[in-house]
Protein backbone atom coordinates (compact mmCIF):
# COMPACT_ATOMS: atom_id res chain seq x y z
CA UNK A 1 0.00 0.00 0.00
CA UNK A 2 1.64 3.26 -1.13
CA UNK A 3 1.59 6.43 0.97
CA UNK A 4 1.54 10.12 0.13
CA UNK A 5 1.72 13.23 2.30
CA UNK A 6 0.04 16.53 1.60
CA UNK A 7 -1.43 19.61 3.22
CA UNK A 8 -5.14 20.24 2.93
CA UNK A 9 -8.34 21.76 4.26
CA UNK A 10 -11.19 19.58 5.48
CA UNK A 11 -14.30 20.49 3.48
CA UNK A 12 -16.83 18.06 4.91
CA UNK A 13 -17.24 14.73 6.65
CA UNK A 14 -19.80 11.93 6.50
CA UNK A 15 -20.40 8.97 8.79
CA UNK A 16 -19.19 5.53 7.79
CA UNK A 17 -20.14 2.55 9.93
CA UNK A 18 -20.16 2.92 13.71
CA UNK A 19 -16.86 4.69 14.31
CA UNK A 20 -15.41 5.92 11.02
CA UNK A 21 -15.90 8.94 8.79
CA UNK A 22 -15.22 9.74 5.16
CA UNK A 23 -13.24 12.98 5.08
CA UNK A 24 -13.33 15.21 2.00
CA UNK A 25 -10.19 17.34 1.79
CA UNK A 26 -8.93 19.86 -0.74
CA UNK A 27 -5.17 19.35 -0.80
CA UNK A 28 -2.37 21.52 -2.08
CA UNK A 29 -0.83 18.94 -4.38
CA UNK A 30 -3.44 16.22 -5.00
CA UNK A 31 -6.61 18.24 -5.45
CA UNK A 32 -9.79 17.03 -3.78
CA UNK A 33 -9.54 13.65 -2.11
CA UNK A 34 -11.91 11.45 -0.10
CA UNK A 35 -10.35 9.27 2.56
CA UNK A 36 -11.55 7.16 5.47
CA UNK A 37 -10.54 8.24 8.98
CA UNK A 38 -10.87 5.05 11.00
CA UNK A 39 -12.13 5.36 14.57
CA UNK A 40 -12.42 9.15 14.33
CA UNK A 41 -15.88 9.15 15.97
CA UNK A 42 -14.64 7.38 19.09
CA UNK A 43 -14.15 9.52 22.20
CA UNK A 44 -10.46 8.68 22.42
CA UNK A 45 -9.70 8.92 18.71
CA UNK A 46 -6.05 9.60 17.91
CA UNK A 47 -7.18 12.24 15.41
CA UNK A 48 -8.98 14.37 18.01
CA UNK A 49 -10.66 17.36 16.33
CA UNK A 50 -8.03 17.64 13.62
CA UNK A 51 -10.30 16.23 10.90
CA UNK A 52 -13.26 18.56 11.44
CA UNK A 53 -14.46 20.98 8.71
CA UNK A 54 -12.36 24.12 8.15
CA UNK A 55 -9.25 22.54 9.71
CA UNK A 56 -6.00 22.94 7.78
CA UNK A 57 -3.99 19.78 8.26
CA UNK A 58 -0.90 17.91 7.19
CA UNK A 59 -2.06 14.40 6.32
CA UNK A 60 -0.39 11.11 5.51
CA UNK A 61 -2.67 9.11 3.23
CA UNK A 62 -2.55 5.42 2.36
CA UNK A 63 -3.92 4.64 -1.08
CA UNK A 64 -6.78 2.15 -1.07
CA UNK A 65 -8.75 0.26 -3.71
CA UNK A 66 -11.94 2.30 -3.47
CA UNK A 67 -11.15 4.90 -0.82
CA UNK A 68 -7.85 6.12 0.56
CA UNK A 69 -7.21 5.95 4.32
CA UNK A 70 -5.94 8.71 6.61
CA UNK A 71 -2.90 7.32 8.43
CA UNK A 72 -1.79 10.51 10.20
CA UNK A 73 -3.13 14.05 10.61
CA UNK A 74 -1.45 17.04 12.22
CA UNK A 75 -2.98 20.49 12.55
CA UNK A 76 -1.37 23.27 10.51
CA UNK A 77 -3.95 25.97 11.30
CA UNK A 78 -7.03 25.58 13.49
CA UNK A 79 -9.47 27.81 11.61
CA UNK A 80 -12.44 25.86 12.96
CA UNK A 81 -12.60 27.18 16.54
CA UNK A 82 -12.57 30.94 15.82
CA UNK A 83 -14.93 30.49 12.88
CA UNK A 84 -17.40 28.41 14.91
CA UNK A 85 -17.37 31.06 17.65
CA UNK A 86 -18.97 33.61 15.29
CA UNK A 87 -22.19 32.55 13.58
CA UNK A 88 -21.79 34.91 10.61
CA UNK A 89 -18.27 33.60 10.04
CA UNK A 90 -19.54 30.02 10.34
CA UNK A 91 -22.21 30.68 7.69
CA UNK A 92 -19.64 32.25 5.37
CA UNK A 93 -17.24 29.34 5.89
CA UNK A 94 -19.98 26.90 4.89
CA UNK A 95 -20.53 28.90 1.70
CA UNK A 96 -16.81 28.78 0.99
CA UNK A 97 -16.31 25.04 1.44
CA UNK A 98 -19.51 24.20 -0.44
CA UNK A 99 -18.39 26.36 -3.36
CA UNK A 100 -14.97 24.77 -3.72
CA UNK A 101 -16.46 21.30 -3.19
CA UNK A 102 -18.68 21.93 -6.23
CA UNK A 103 -15.91 23.54 -8.32
CA UNK A 104 -13.49 20.68 -7.60
CA UNK A 105 -15.80 18.14 -9.22
CA UNK A 106 -12.99 15.78 -10.28
CA UNK A 107 -11.00 14.08 -7.54
CA UNK A 108 -7.20 14.35 -7.60
CA UNK A 109 -7.27 17.28 -10.07
CA UNK A 110 -4.55 19.68 -8.93
CA UNK A 111 -5.95 23.14 -8.14
CA UNK A 112 -3.10 25.07 -6.48
CA UNK A 113 -4.58 28.52 -7.11
CA UNK A 114 -7.94 27.45 -5.73
CA UNK A 115 -6.18 26.04 -2.68
CA UNK A 116 -4.36 29.32 -2.01
CA UNK A 117 -7.61 31.26 -2.37
CA UNK A 118 -9.36 28.88 0.04
CA UNK A 119 -6.62 29.28 2.65
CA UNK A 120 -6.77 33.07 2.33
CA UNK A 121 -10.54 33.18 2.78
CA UNK A 122 -10.64 30.91 5.83
CA UNK A 123 -7.71 32.76 7.39
CA UNK A 124 -9.52 36.08 6.88
CA UNK A 125 -12.65 34.67 8.54
CA UNK A 126 -10.69 33.27 11.49
CA UNK A 127 -8.90 36.60 12.02
CA UNK A 128 -12.08 38.66 11.44
CA UNK A 129 -10.19 40.71 8.85
CA UNK A 130 -13.39 41.85 7.10
CA UNK A 131 -17.16 41.36 7.31
CA UNK A 132 -17.92 37.62 6.98
CA UNK A 133 -20.61 38.21 4.33
CA UNK A 134 -18.15 40.12 2.15
CA UNK A 135 -15.45 37.47 2.59
CA UNK A 136 -17.85 34.73 1.56
CA UNK A 137 -19.29 36.60 -1.42
CA UNK A 138 -15.85 37.67 -2.62
CA UNK A 139 -14.57 34.12 -2.31
CA UNK A 140 -17.44 32.74 -4.40
CA UNK A 141 -16.84 35.20 -7.23
CA UNK A 142 -13.04 34.85 -7.17
CA UNK A 143 -13.21 31.05 -7.06
CA UNK A 144 -15.61 31.06 -10.01
CA UNK A 145 -13.29 33.45 -11.84
CA UNK A 146 -10.36 31.06 -11.30
CA UNK A 147 -12.54 28.30 -12.74
CA UNK A 148 -13.02 30.38 -15.90
CA UNK A 149 -16.32 32.12 -15.18
CA UNK A 150 -15.26 35.75 -14.85
CA UNK A 151 -17.97 38.30 -15.68
CA UNK A 152 -17.08 40.96 -18.23
CA UNK A 153 -18.01 44.20 -16.49
CA UNK A 154 -16.10 46.96 -18.29
CA UNK A 155 -17.66 46.88 -21.74
CA UNK A 156 -20.79 45.53 -23.42
CA UNK A 157 -20.41 41.85 -24.33
CA UNK A 158 -22.22 42.51 -27.63
CA UNK A 159 -20.78 45.73 -29.06
CA UNK A 160 -17.83 46.52 -26.79
CA UNK A 161 -19.05 49.96 -25.76
CA UNK A 162 -18.09 51.14 -22.29
CA UNK A 163 -21.71 51.87 -21.42
CA UNK A 164 -22.77 49.18 -18.94
CA UNK A 165 -26.46 49.49 -18.12
CA UNK A 166 -27.55 45.86 -17.81
CA UNK A 167 -26.04 42.58 -16.64
CA UNK A 168 -26.78 39.26 -18.34
CA UNK A 169 -25.59 36.23 -16.42
CA UNK A 170 -26.21 33.92 -19.38
CA UNK A 171 -24.18 36.18 -21.70
CA UNK A 172 -21.36 36.52 -19.19
CA UNK A 173 -21.34 40.23 -18.46
CA UNK A 174 -22.71 43.71 -18.95
CA UNK A 175 -24.70 45.05 -21.88
CA UNK A 176 -25.47 48.52 -23.13
CA UNK A 177 -28.94 50.04 -23.46
CA UNK A 178 -29.17 49.25 -27.18
CA UNK A 179 -28.00 45.64 -27.11
CA UNK A 180 -29.34 44.20 -23.87
CA UNK A 181 -31.30 40.96 -24.05
CA UNK A 182 -34.58 40.17 -22.32
CA UNK A 183 -32.86 38.15 -19.59
CA UNK A 184 -30.54 41.02 -18.65
CA UNK A 185 -31.25 42.96 -15.48
CA UNK A 186 -30.68 46.70 -15.15
CA UNK A 187 -27.69 47.37 -12.94
CA UNK A 188 -26.98 50.61 -11.08
CA UNK A 189 -23.41 51.98 -11.05
CA UNK A 190 -23.00 51.45 -7.28
CA UNK A 191 -24.15 47.82 -7.66
CA UNK A 192 -21.72 47.23 -10.51
CA UNK A 193 -18.92 48.84 -8.48
CA UNK A 194 -19.51 46.59 -5.47
CA UNK A 195 -19.93 43.48 -7.62
CA UNK A 196 -16.65 44.27 -9.36
CA UNK A 197 -14.96 44.84 -5.99
CA UNK A 198 -15.99 41.35 -4.87
CA UNK A 199 -14.34 39.83 -7.94
CA UNK A 200 -11.14 41.85 -7.54
CA UNK A 201 -10.99 41.53 -3.75
CA UNK A 202 -10.93 45.32 -3.42
CA UNK A 203 -11.33 45.73 0.33
CA UNK A 204 -11.14 49.51 0.23
CA UNK A 205 -14.56 49.36 -1.44
CA UNK A 206 -15.95 46.35 0.42
CA UNK A 207 -15.01 47.62 3.88
CA UNK A 208 -16.72 50.95 3.22
CA UNK A 209 -20.28 49.55 3.24
CA UNK A 210 -22.10 46.23 3.71
CA UNK A 211 -22.65 44.14 0.59
CA UNK A 212 -25.99 45.24 -0.88
CA UNK A 213 -28.80 42.70 -1.04
CA UNK A 214 -29.02 43.04 -4.82
CA UNK A 215 -25.29 42.27 -5.07
CA UNK A 216 -25.70 39.22 -2.84
CA UNK A 217 -28.42 38.00 -5.21
CA UNK A 218 -26.10 38.50 -8.19
CA UNK A 219 -23.46 36.35 -6.48
CA UNK A 220 -26.02 33.63 -5.75
CA UNK A 221 -27.43 33.67 -9.29
CA UNK A 222 -23.99 33.77 -10.95
CA UNK A 223 -22.85 30.78 -8.91
CA UNK A 224 -25.99 28.77 -9.58
CA UNK A 225 -25.87 29.42 -13.33
CA UNK A 226 -22.23 28.49 -13.91
CA UNK A 227 -22.05 25.63 -11.41
CA UNK A 228 -25.39 24.39 -12.79
CA UNK A 229 -26.70 23.91 -9.27
CA UNK A 230 -27.34 26.25 -6.34
CA UNK A 231 -24.88 27.03 -3.58
CA UNK A 232 -27.32 26.04 -0.85
CA UNK A 233 -25.39 27.61 2.02
CA UNK A 234 -25.42 30.94 0.18
CA UNK A 235 -29.15 30.67 -0.40
CA UNK A 236 -29.70 30.16 3.34
CA UNK A 237 -27.76 33.34 4.16
CA UNK A 238 -29.60 35.39 1.54
CA UNK A 239 -33.07 34.15 2.55
UniProtKB/Swiss-Prot annotation:
Cited function: Involved in DNA repair and RecF pathway recombination.
InterPro entries, per database record: ARFGAP/RecO (IPR037278), DNA_rep/recomb_RecO_N (IPR022572), NA-bd_OB-fold (IPR012340), RecO (IPR003717), RecO_C (IPR042242)
A single Gene Ontology CC term: bacterial nucleoid
UniProtKB keywords: DNA damage, DNA recombination, DNA repair
GO BP, one annotated term: double-strand break repair
Listed PANTHER family: DNA REPAIR PROTEIN RECO
Keyword Repressor assigned: no
Highest taxon above the source species: Bacteria
Underlying gene: recO
Pfam families xrefs: RecO_C, RecO_N
Source organism per UniProt: Bifidobacterium longum (strain NCC 2705)
Keyword DNA repair on entry: yes
Family: Belongs to the RecO family.
Protein name: DNA repair protein RecO
Amino acid sequence: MSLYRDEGVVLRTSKLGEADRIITILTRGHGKIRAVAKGVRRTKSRFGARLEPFMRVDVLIAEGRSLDVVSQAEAVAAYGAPIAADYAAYEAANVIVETIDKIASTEHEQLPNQYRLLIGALNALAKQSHAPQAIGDSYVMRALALAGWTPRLGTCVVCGKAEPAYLSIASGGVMCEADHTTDARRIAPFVLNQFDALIRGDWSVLDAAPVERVVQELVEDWGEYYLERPIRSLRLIDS
